[in-house]
Amino acid sequence: MQRPVAVVSLKDIRANLRLLARRAGVPVIAVVKDDAYGHGAEAVAHAIADMVAMFAVATVDEGARLVAAGVGRDVLVLTPLTSDMDALRARAYGLVVTAASFPSLAFCRGLRAHLAVNTGMNRYGFSPCEIASALQAAARLEVRVEGVFSHLYEPSDSVAVKEQTRAFAACAQQVRSAYPNAVRHLCATGGILAGGASFDAVRPGLGLYGYAPPPFTAELSPAMRVFAQVVQNTAPYGGGAGYAAAAKKFSALHTLGAGYGHGFFRAGGMGAEGRLCMDACVREGRLPFGTQVCVLDDAAAYAAQHGTTAYEVLVAVGKGMEKVYDG
């Protein structure tokens, strides 16, 4: 095994989902974008399909792969459409698309869609003053509006959450005046843990995979561990330890087959003594040749060492890595 392997616990993902669903008390739209945050979208979706109302992905390509895998649930594409090709593929695979602006709405003709509302994050969405016009345009284009959603930009800020919730509720009421069965959803993992308004559904992402966005805490279980193999033991010669001068004199070093080419940060971590190599890192001590070593079991702790978030670590490390599923 020359490359690291990610061991993903589907049992833990299901347990995390149960916890979040209990907190929210409404159906779940499970976010499996970016290959389920690096955990493998098809495998994760099959494991939790019986527990969710719908899946959400980033792109039409991601949605098409889920449908082709036979996950048996509707799939919402969160990124607005930008081309006729997107629209054709969305139609072919029966995807639910996002209409977030008048240009994106134009590509949604005849499609099932959720309207995105910009309540303060300023990423995607119609502004509240555009909702009435958007509904008129949707009717002209025969868009089948099945939902309306927004996103909390700082779920730990109670004042901001209150303002966004109020704005969203007003916009959702307008949408429901034209489409009474439109599903309203606002809260992702942070919003759920903050006790935000659940409306008709919630959209957990990070929490499914075992992490609460700071500053929240919850009894979630990280679902991915990454293992790398000892590929050499070295009696040190000269002054290096990987790509750096050794900080001290070593009596023994070993090399693991994991580096920044596998999504880890070049600056270090994983117990490395120097900067990581592309496909390897050097650590102190001696371990039997071929030993499997866990190099990542807490993405939040690893992220904190590098001034980033668990989101970035999971997506970077999980991307393209061989995965073994447990439970």
Predicted regions and their residues:
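Active-site-proximal beta-alpha core segment in soluble small-molecule metabolic enzymes
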Residues: P4-A15, R23-V183
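Active-site anion/phosphate-binding pocket segments in diverse small-molecule metabolic enzymes
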Residues: M1-L10, R14, V28, E62, ...
